[in-house]
């Protein structure tokens, strides 16, 4: 399931009329370039690339050139678009859910520390803390729902297709119902991380920032980037394919 994208593959798969979610689905390494331009490819992944460029006065040709010329060593080593759905669900848990759980204690420690030390001179830090706590609690409640309810059902759909049998009816009726809830929670988490980015002026350090301040901002920015890819894999690949598979069966 691993595939290194060649320049030829990249160039022939990008179109201005594709949604930004579809573009990143072709190569998750494109996410870094979209991040640079503030393009929302996860919660807002269903909007066309050209529409976003026009709305935000971005040079579409320049961005496409950057995508097409991405060095091969930076290209994605996973072809997520063609992952088995069960494997993709497992990947999300193993990589992204693990990342969240491992990083929360560190962010808790550092963010609370700089609020105590620098909060008087930088009151915006308390807004950062409030939004971080909101996204933290959202994710800690959200991930078990996926791990214990939605993802096991996706595995059952995959098994049903492989064995040419009808899947047992789930208690939630259709996969669209938990997916709708997961997407709403993704939106909430995405809004909170946007607030953090705005409050920190894109994670710009103040002149009096200490090493703890720097580490905190690095942790928060990495947390945001991982969350964007995490949500993208679900909203733009896993969820639509799970809905299509259930309808097919």
Question: Language model features by range: what are they?
Answer:
Residues 3-249:
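Small-residue-biased structural context
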């Amino acid at each position: 399931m691993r595939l290194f994208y060649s320049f030829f593959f990249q160039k022939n798969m990008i179109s201005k009329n594709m949604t930004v979610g579809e573009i990143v689905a072709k190569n998750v390494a494109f996410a870094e370039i979209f991040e640079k331009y503030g393009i929302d490819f996860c919660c807002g992944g269903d909007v066309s690339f050209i529409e976003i460029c026009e709305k935000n006065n971005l040079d579409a040709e320049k961005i496409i050139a950057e995508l097409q010329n991405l060095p091969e060593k930076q290209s994605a080593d996973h072809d997520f678009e063609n992952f088995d759905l069960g494997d993709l669900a497992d990947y999300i848990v193993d990589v992204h859910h693990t990342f969240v759980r491992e990083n929360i204690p560190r962010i808790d420690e550092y963010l609370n520390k700089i609020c105590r030390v620098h909060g008087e001179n930088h009151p915006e830090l308390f807004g950062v803390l409030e939004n971080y706590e909101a996204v933290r609690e959202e994710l800690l409640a959200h991930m078990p729902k996926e791990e214990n309810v939605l993802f096991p059902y996706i595995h059952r759909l995959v098994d049903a297709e492989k064995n040419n049998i009808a899947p047992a009816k789930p208690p939630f009726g259709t996969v669209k119902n938990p997916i709708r809830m997961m997407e709403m929670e993704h939106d909430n988490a995405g809004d909170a991380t946007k607030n953090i980015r705005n409050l920190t002026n894109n994670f710009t350090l103040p002149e009096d920032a200490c090493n703890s301040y720097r580490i905190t901002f690095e942790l928060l920015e990495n947390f945001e980037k991982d969350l964007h890819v995490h949500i993208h894999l679900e909203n733009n690949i896993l969820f639509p394919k799970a809905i299509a598979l259930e309808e097919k069966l």
